[in-house]
Each structure stands twice: as C-alpha cells, then as structure tokens.
Amino acid sequence: MNERKWLWVLEADIQGCFDKISHDWMLANIPTDKVILKKWLKAGYVYQNELFPTAAGTPQGGIISPVAANMTLDGLEARLAEKFPRARQRGLKMNMVRYADDFIITGHSKEWLEHEVRPAVAEFLAERGLVLSPEKTRITHIKDGFDFLGWNIRKYNGKLLMKPSKANVKAHLDKIREIIKANKMAKQANLIRLLNPVVRGWANYHSHVVAKKTFDRVDHEVWSMLWRWAARRHPNKGARWIKTKYFKTKGLRDWVFAATEKEEDGTTREVTLLKVADTPIKRHVKIKAGANPHDPQWAPYFESRWGQKMLNSARGRGKLYRVWLRQDGTCSNCQQPITMTTRWDVSHIVKPTDGGTDAAGNLQVHHLNCRRTPQHA
C-alpha cells in the first residue's frame, strides 16, 4: 500500500437511515411495481398491539427494509467517481467500501475528504431524505485505525492489519454472559448447546482476519464466566470437586467444559463447549470483479474456488478422500494415479448451474491438466 495515495478514511454514519428514507424518492427511482412498493412502504408496523404508520423510512426488521435501503444507497460510488474523475487519474486512490448503510471512503488528505467528498456525499443523501450524523461521522488517519463491520483496521509499522474490534468483542462477551446468566440452573449440556452456535458463528466471522490473540483472550473470559457459573451452583463445594464435575481433560488439554449425558438407548454421549481458538485463521481470497456464479462462462473459476474451499475444511477433505477411494485413487479422465505429488483438482460431474449438488456422488477428482468429464461414465 502506497501511503502517499491512501492515508485518510471518512467513516460515514447515516442518521436513522432506515427511519428517514424518502418514500417519494423510492417510489420514483426503485425499479419495481409501484403499487406493491407503495403498499410495502405504507404498511406501518405493530408495537404492543398498536399500529403505527410509516410516513418515511422502512421499519427495521421488515423483510423489504434491507433491500430497499441498499437500493436507495446504490449509485453513491458512481456519483463520487463522476464528481472526482481526476482523483484516479492522479493516482489518489479514492475508494469506497459499502455494506448496507455502513460505508467508508478513503482519500489522500483530511482536507479533501472534509471539504470536497463529505459535501458530495451529503448532497447524494439529501436527495433521498437522509443526512450524515455530525457526531458519528469522522475522518481518521489510517495509522490511528477505524472500526468497520466489527473489525478494527489499522496500520502497524507500515503494515495494514484487520482485527476484531473492541466493541465487537465486548458485544460478543456480553451475549455469552447473558446466556449464562439466563441459565443459572440449566443442565450443563443444555447450556453448552445454547453457547456453541454463538461461539461458532462469531469465530467463523472473524476467521479471516488477525484474530488469534483475541480468540485466546475471549476463550479465557468465557472460561472465567463458566467457572463462576459452576461455583455459584455449589457454594459448599471446593474447587477440586467443581473442576472434576464440570471440566474434563481431553488429550493434552485440561479444563475442557464438557458434560456427559445418557441417551434413550442407555449409551452415553459427551457434549463439549467449542473453543474459539480452535478455529483456524484462513485469509479470504477476494472474488474477481464481475464474476457471476450463474453465468456458465464463470463456471471453471467458481469450480476452482469451491475446490480450494473443500480442501481448507476437514469435512471437505474427508469427502474428497471418499471420492478418491471411489475412483481407486486414479484420475476420472486419464485413469492414471493421483498422488500427493501430482497436481490435481476437483469438479462437479453435473454442474451446479445445471442442478448438480455438492454430494460426494456428484464429485470427481482429476489431474489439473486433464479435461473434466461432463458426466458419469
């Protein structure tokens, strides 16, 4: 990254975006059936058995709200590119990244973002009945970092790093704490079942950024919460008794929060709390601009991405191994051996665009240079 071209970030915050979008603008500009759209926009919402009208905006929680808001903000990037055509010509790296109503704009100077870009954004939003929040919209130097979509993005000694933001970590731990607090007398196995989806979802979301140290700290915080949960249930028991009852030893790992429960057939099963730190960190590979998964011309590209994703997951590797065994360890095309030293690939027999699935029976492995077979032999 060239610091001369990319130093400052405009962190934009739209004041009450979902509540203030102009209905007139949406009805005039969103390309859909106007009668249906108007009914959606004017339907109102019910709170405590009382109907509230919607004169502006789209109620949060409504099915159409995220789509309508996204379509309302569509075109901002094109507007900025049209207004500042010389920025790219001079290599000044004005870029915009937007997700729903959250967006950032990069620029070469604080003054340029403040006095030229910000007014252009405000003008675009005003046409749609929206305004930037004066308190929450700010311009930040990349060395100081900024939060976006749950991550903190900052330069450390010239290197740009993305980490889970402090606010996002706090929100996650607060959610874990609330679940534990609401289940003081629950069975341990039931508590684990409530926690695991939350732990897994949060860990997967951050698995593409620099998160290893954060994962370790979060695991320690959760362990502390669970120790207090267990100790409060048995105020007359000692620490050793509590550890034996609630925390197991698995292989080389001690203090694993796990419970053993009986099944209806009399067998036992162990339910174990997931550890965030067990989630591998894997860098995200950006999809090529313009790639369309529904366009047959892009099928080889998405096949390659999908195959790499299979290799990166334990479940995917197991499935590929079964396909390899089914083919007797040979290429589906040339019937020559596929080994660790040969370059190989995986593809669908019936393409997903033609209704094919990801089931093992619809997969084939072949040498990288072999043409894939269109169907089973």
Task: Outline where the language-model segments fall.
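Short, charged surface segments at domain edges that flank catalytic/cofactor-binding sites
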Residues: 291-333, 357, 361
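Glycine- and acidic
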Residues: 11-12, 54-62, 100-106, 180-181, ...
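Residues immediately flanking
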Residues: 12-14, 108-109, 151, 201, ...
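Non-catalytic, peripheral interaction segments enriched in hydrophobic/basic residues
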Residues: 187, 191-248
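Acidic catalytic cores of enzymes that act on phosphate-bearing nucleotides/polynucleotides
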Residues: 228-230, 236-310
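A conserved non-catalytic segment of reverse transcriptases
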Residues: 42, 51, 127-193, 197-202
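Conserved polymerase palm-domain catalytic core
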Residues: 1-145, 329
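Histidine-centered nuclease catalytic patch
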Residues: 335-368, 374
